[in-house]
């Protein structure tokens, strides 16, 4: 059985090809995809006709409320591509190539008010909680560690923290709500004033409201994270930016832990920053603020989780962490 998981992330498109216990992972920068065919790149690693199922994520994923075959999905599964985050165009090209190819594929939804497994209070509070790759990451953590109850914090360009309770996604905080990531973060009073004054759009504010605003350093969506981390020990702004990120993520995790029984309080960290051990040990630093056992989900967890979702769908699973699957 060969499945493919595709993670449409901020800085690139990551692919996991899973052939039973073997995995092949490759990543393409979103800017690279403007000149390349995604399927041609995929075919360098696997014959397309051997693929049994692809699981795909795209943008906010707020236009669908189930995992659906790609041919049943309208408008790529989104209400609008406007909103939170920079638009580069690589993900759109990947999605359209796969749909036009006729390859068997399913589209994973994001977490939003239409997802019925979410607690009604979270659905009342927030229109959107997470983009689809966070579902894939949560599923990989669920399968790898075997936990039915845990808090997942995915820390990278942005930070999204989810609560999984009794094997279902219960709630969480989107990138624009609580903790900052390296690029994205919540909009504060100063930014609201700048938006109202017409100096910046809300989306532009969100896209640079993370650690980048404290570091006062921006090298584009693909290189800023590395630049800030590499300057942690020799630039005071970069040090403060990362320390502030650690504090904000810890506060977000701690706000969800009380919703779990004390003996079920576990934290899983994911993402390029959440799993970073050198030159800064991020999991160790977060543990200083969090009274729970911390586990680290290494690797390209969004793509791997997608491949696992596709595999389990082929095996007959029709519920992924509480999200319904429609597949024949």
Curated annotation (Swiss-Prot):
The record, for SUPFAM superfamilies, names:
Actin-like ATPase domain (SSF53067)
Family, as annotated: Belongs to the UPF0285 family.
Note the NCBIfam families from the entry. Answer: methan_mark_12 (TIGR03281)
Name listed for the protein in its UniProt record = UPF0285 protein MJ1370
